[in-house]
Regions:
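C-terminal helix-rich "cap/oligomerization" subdomain common to oxidoreductases
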Residues: 1-9, 14, 34, 74-77, ...
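Beta-strand-loop-alpha-helix segment that lines the small-molecule cofactor/substrate pocket
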Residues: 2-6, 74-132, 147
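N-terminal Rossmann-like dinucleotide-binding module
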Residues: 2-54
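Conserved SAM-binding strand-loop segment of SAM-dependent methyltransferases
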Residues: 56-63
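Short glycine/proline- and charge-enriched loop/turn segments
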Residues: 95, 169-177, 276-285
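Predominantly a Rossmann-like dinucleotide-binding segment in NAD(P)-dependent oxidoreductases
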Residues: 124, 131-214, 336
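Contiguous beta-strand/loop segments that form the cofactor/metal-binding neighborhood of enzyme cores
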Residues: 189-265, 296-312, 344-345
Length: 345
């Protein structure tokens, strides 16, 4: 079967009965275009409570039972990153639309295989880079695009998330190929790419002190060359001892934006109409509507694109490009020299 037929109501399957899986289920249930048709998890003890709570028509422990189900229209993959390639390819070849959680995959080569199958089948593949639907970050992008802070000079974001005790079911996060900069740091990288464009070069440092029993560095900092002579920085730590944050700052020639995905306001510094420098010391606090994980907005955009026959809001190439930057960053921290970033074709 080639392509995805547009319709007004979509039978959805959520693969992965985890905390994030539940967020996606709740997001689907809030959408009038979605029907929670099926759920799947390889662990029966994780599947049963979801089956009892949400009562889907189908509940299975093997995703392959859903691949050729004629009643299924689209799947949301909330599974370990190592499974993204295998599952995405299977569902795309069966003519199902796919919303795959971030990161798209753990290597650029895997991403390119997914892109190739999407193109070959005429399928629909969206990557769940949820920061693009976060109200504060959406507003920051709008303010920057409108020229509110002038021309960008420097951008920075951080992903500080204590992974102590967060090894994942069957330790799926604790594998050598899942570096924290790829698995979690892709959020911050994707945000800066979305706002400042594709960086061309990266240099970075990393250490391994916070989670010594994990197989990869747990703290890293990277500096990027962005288009238009904009510089950027991303800090990632999965071994930190603090509450979660994605604090991000955007510096421009006329002002500065400070925001994150947990605060109830965005902070804006800007020059007033008279050009007064005093305005820099008096920030404007712009109220922000918080949305937990923003999966509701993400799913809404996914289904709207399917219904209207439009391109995916976060395309496979976009998802792969973020992975490309993350992979190059890990390489830079290991080699000790700047790395030129290779993007997907």
């Amino acid at each position: 079967m080639e392509g995805v037929m547009a319709k007004n109501k979509w039978n959805i399957a959520v693969i992965g009965c985890s905390g994030m899986g539940k967020q996606h289920i709740l997001g689907a249930l809030k959408n009038e275009k979605a029907v929670l048709y099926a759920i799947c998890d390889s662990a029966p003890e994780r599947l049963k409570p979801f089956k009892d709570e949400f009562a889907p028509e189908v509940a299975v422990t093997d995703y392959r039972e859903l691949v050729n189900d004629p009643k299924l229209d689209a799947v949301i993959l909330v599974v370990p990153d190592q499974l993204h390639l295998e599952m995405s390819v299977a569902f795309l070849r069966a003519g199902k639309a796919v919303l795959c959680e971030k990161p798209m995959a753990l290597s650029l080569e895997e991403c390119e295989k997914m892109i190739a199958v999407e193109r070959e089948t005429g399928g629909k593949l969206m990557i769940g880079q949820v920061c693009r639907f976060t109200p504060a970050f959406v507003m920051a992008k709008e303010l920057i695009s409108s020229g509110r802070i002038g021309e960008l000079t420097f951008v920075e974001s951080e992903y500080a998330h204590n992974y102590t005790g967060a090894r994942g079911y069957n330790d799926w996060r604790v594998v050598p190929e899942r570096h924290g900069f790829i698995g979690g740091g892709c959020h911050a990288v994707d945000l800066l790419r979305w706002i400042a464009g594709d960086p061309t070069e990266v240099f970075g440092y990393a250490n391994h002190k916070g989670l010594p029993d994990w197989p990869t560095d747990d703290t890293a900092i990277a500096v990027y060359k962005f288009p238009n002579d904009v510089m950027g920085k991303v800090f990632v730590s999965i071994g930190c001892r603090r509450n979660y944050t994605m604090r991000s700052v955007f510096y421009g020639t006329k002002g500065t934006i400070i925001c994150d995905n947990k605060s109830e306001h965005l902070t804006l510094f800007e020059t007033d109409e008279s050009g007064s420098h005093s305005s820099y010391t008096v920030p404007k606090l712009i109220p922000i509507k918080l949305a937990d994980h923003n999966t509701t907005g993400e799913i809404e955009m996914f289904l709207d694109a399917l219904t209207e026959g439009k391109p995916m809001p976060v395309s496979s190439v976009e998802g792969a490009s973020t992975v490309a930057v993350c992979v190059a960053t890990v390489e830079a921290t290991k080699s000790g020299v700047p790395v030129q970033i290779r993007y997907p074709v």
